[in-house]
Amino acid sequence: MNDCLELKITNAMHRIEDLYFKTGGKCYLSFSGGKDSTVILALIKMCEDILTIPKNSIPAVFCDTGIELVATKDFVIWVKNNWYKNVEIIRPEKTFTWIINNKGKPVKSKIKSQFLSRYQKGNTSKNTMLNLLGKNKKVIKAKIANKDLHMIHPDFDIKVSDSCCLILKKKPFEKYNKENDIKGYIIGERIAEGGARELSASKRVNMGGEDMHQNKRSVYS
């Protein structure tokens, strides 16, 4: 095995073990059914194989938002039945349709939706406009393309909101955290995937790798 890859795997396993013991086992993997969190689950199983953490001790928590691909849901069920027993499925209280009808529609990306929503709510401050027009290099991901400038025209009648992620994903996990006295959680994310995750991971790297929020661990990047 490549020495660099082996070192990354070892470091990732150490971070998983460290979080497990620092939280007294009150932690989980945020499992999306995608390749990144599946890699983390494989690393958790590797820790179990060498007996550094108990078997099936870290729940892999999947949030069924109702808008995942059928193939993703099928894979999560397969994992639970065939590969890792401790998979828990949680669900949001509201549906995607309810969000569209009551909060607004997500467009382009979470960051763009956030600033477009602020603009539509009357926040026409200089900073908001600079972000949408790409003049603020710190949040360049908020820039809307020239072909989308009609979205800031007064006649644009589609209500935009970034509430989708908050209601469908963040709130269900917050509820799970509270109900289970969770002290920390693990995610798999790559800086290269861009958007809000890139900004979050980059900030963490700039802070010297210190974990942010509630003992959140991104065990590899």
Please annotate each region the language model reported.
Residues 1-220:
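ATP-dependent adenylation/nucleotidyltransferase module used to activate substrates
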